[in-house]
Amino acid sequence: MDLNGFLLDEEGAFSLSGFQEFTFLPRHQQLSERVRKRLYYGWDKECTLDNLSSPVADIAVELLQKVAPSPIRRLQKKYVSHVSREACISPCSMMLALVYIERLRHRNPEYLQQISSSDLFLISMMVASKYLYDEGEEEEVFNDEWGAAGKVDVQTMNTLEMNFLSAIDWSLYTDPRELFEVLSWLEGRVAEKQGMWRGWFTYTDLCVLMEQSMWQQALGHFYQQVVKLACLLGVVYLTGFAAVFTSIAVVHRAVCTRSTSITALRPALIPVESGCQLGAQPALAPEQPQPKLPDVSPPSSTHCLGENETAEELRRGGVTATALYLWGSVMTALSYVKAPDIALHKSPLQAPLRKVPTACERSNRTAPVTAPNQPGPFGLAVLLAPPALHCHTCSAAARPTWDATPNHRKDWLDPLGLRQCFLHAALDLGRIKSFIFPS
């Protein structure tokens, strides 16, 4: 870039008129984009920043009416728009004027009580513009032009200017940090006002508000409350979850205990397996004395006890107890079935080994024998079977007996020696059919 042609005029003399264009500075471009974006000046880069935007004018009216509460010539937005358009007030002039007003509010509040808000706006903008655009610049505006823009004569403008400079003690220099602080405050006020007016905030408004210290503190406090609420809800949720699981466990345990107690009160409903009935002795009459017999239980009795313990453990569940009850009912009904003799030889599965006396034997049994004199299995005395009364359809050998002959000795009863009444068998078979096929 040729600085000589930029700084020197046609006659070769040094000229400062070229410094009126600062658009080539990168910081100037960033500041211009920031002002356009956050102060609602629009996205059109062709539009010049030579007047105040509507949101900025609203903030100026609100602030000056509060600072200068005099009822004479109260500042209106229409007047602000007219002056800013006629005098070409830039956003930087507006921010510098706000810095001056803030100084007056702290140094000379009496001056603000005497001047009207319209005059304060006019004179503060004029002093700020003169400070930014000194004499010799193209943007300079004389007092008569400011008076015409504000509808005030030149003498009144001169008086207002002298009083303003005296009240501020001619302290017009402003540090750039003060200017950017005012810019940040103005951006926050504009974003807040516009968001509240529309009912929603733009992304730019939210970014501006997040930069404000007051909003940061408020959002931080809000986040803390949200975190506390989330923790409280989490504790309540976990407590309720644990309470539900505990209640389910207690109810389940109570149901299981109740099922176990009911099953223990009715043990006869669950039949003993057929393998354990082989070692059962015939029931004796309650009025007769029962002799003491030696333990001649086969080795399979230990297996029966183990099966009984297993069955006792299975009864503890309600569903298992119900299944066992149904199965026992079926087995009890099937125990009365009498198959023909031919079927017994052909199908050994239909003739289970059992030692339980039949219905006829239980109803017609008499007193037991007096003394065990005959030798039994394993060289032990065996109690002879008592004489029993049978109906005419039952065989005389229907009761189980031990073979007392020494040459032909059996450790177990003859499975084919049991006989039943055919009449009862027919009735029980019909009952089984009704149980399996109710319809």
Swiss-Prot record:
The segments labelled Disordered in the record are: 283-302
Q: Does the keyword Membrane apply?
A: yes
Recorded GO MF terms = cyclin-dependent protein serine/threonine kinase regulator activity; protein kinase binding
> Which InterPro entries does the UniProt record give?
Cyclin_PHO80-like
A GO cellular component term found in this entry reads:
membrane
Q: Where in the cell is it found?
A: Membrane
What is the protein's membrane topology class? Single-pass membrane protein
Which ranges does the record mark as transmembrane? Answer: 231-251
Q: Does the keyword Transmembrane helix apply?
A: yes
- What Pfam families does the record tag this protein with? Cyclin
For this UniProt record, give its keywords in alphabetical order, as a comma-separated list.
Membrane, Transmembrane, Transmembrane helix
Q: Which family does it belong to?
A: Belongs to the CNPPD1 family.
The molecule here is called Protein CNPPD1
**Gene responsible for this protein:** CNPPD1
